[in-house]
Amino acid sequence: MKSQGRPLPSVAEQFKARLPVYIGLTRLNRPIGTYLLLWPTLWALWLASEGAPSLKNLFIFVFGVLLMRSAGCVINDYADRRIDMHVERTKGRPFAQNQVTEKEALTLFGILVGVSFILVLFTNALTIYLSAGALALASTYPFMKRHTYLPQVVLGAAFAWGIPMAFAAELDAVPQQAWLLYTATVVWTVAYDTMYAMADREDDLKIGVKSTAILFGEADRAAVAGLQVLTLGVLFMVGAQHELGVYYQVSLIIVAVLFVYQQHLIRDRSSQHCFKAFLNNHWVGAAVFLGLVLEFLFRP
């Protein structure tokens, strides 16, 4: 078909033209969220398999993390489509710039979730059953900031959900150790996402968005410190349960140093420093994973 003498663009051409918008909507150009979701999932795969996860499960979970994090960003922007324009850090996002429609975003969300579910079908019945929890958490988190001061707890539950799924995929069971690691990840997520919320606090107060940063108020730094100490304590318990040795313990020392550095960054509560402290948590996840890899690699 032609329009005014010109051929209509093909579906592929239309998609190519929209690709920069979709990349912005899924945050593929900002991988920090993917890293923070991926690290605990890799911890679980390594612990469940004692350092030797199947290549099939490794592919499924790495690709699944990328897809579900992208889906989470899409539904988050859909939920925040009327408020992102009022927040300095988010006013450049596709919805805030009127670059994407609601139908487009929901369609993209459905595609990403659908492909993720297809991946899960190659695991086992227990993992498939648990995947329903992942979808429920990813879909509800964006709306929590309007109803509770604890949306970070829901985010933590969502970001840690790959842990029971990874154990289920490797062992066809979710042992008690998995839930201890899950707890550590939830607490850690609340800590770093509180720092993220501290960066947006002034804008959030103006538009009525709730967060732990607002809940904690002037006690925010102390609350984050307490959560970080608790994270270390639970991770130490995880190591004790799995009889992990020096490499893992050294990784926890590195994590402690990184937490101290983050406290140094947020001491003035500036948006720039709080966001930098949030980003630094990528190295926390990487340090723990490296400790686990070395632990199982050199285990007698």
From Swiss-Prot:
This is 4-hydroxybenzoate octaprenyltransferase. GO terms for molecular function: 4-hydroxybenzoate polyprenyltransferase activity. It catalyses: all-trans-octaprenyl diphosphate + 4-hydroxybenzoate = 4-hydroxy-3-(all-trans-octaprenyl)benzoate + diphosphate. The chain crosses the membrane at residues 32-52, 55-75, 108-128, 149-169, 178-198, 222-242, 246-266, 278-298. Its main location: membrane. GO terms for biological process: ubiquinone biosynthetic process. Pfam families: UbiA (PF01040). It is a multi-pass membrane protein. It is an enzyme of class 2 (transferase). Catalyzes the prenylation of para-hydroxybenzoate (PHB) with an all-trans polyprenyl group. Mediates the second step in the final reaction sequence of ubiquinone-8 (UQ-8) biosynthesis, which is the condensation of the polyisoprenoid side chain with PHB, generating the first membrane-bound Q intermediate 3-octaprenyl-4-hydroxybenzoate. Its EC number is 2.5.1.39.
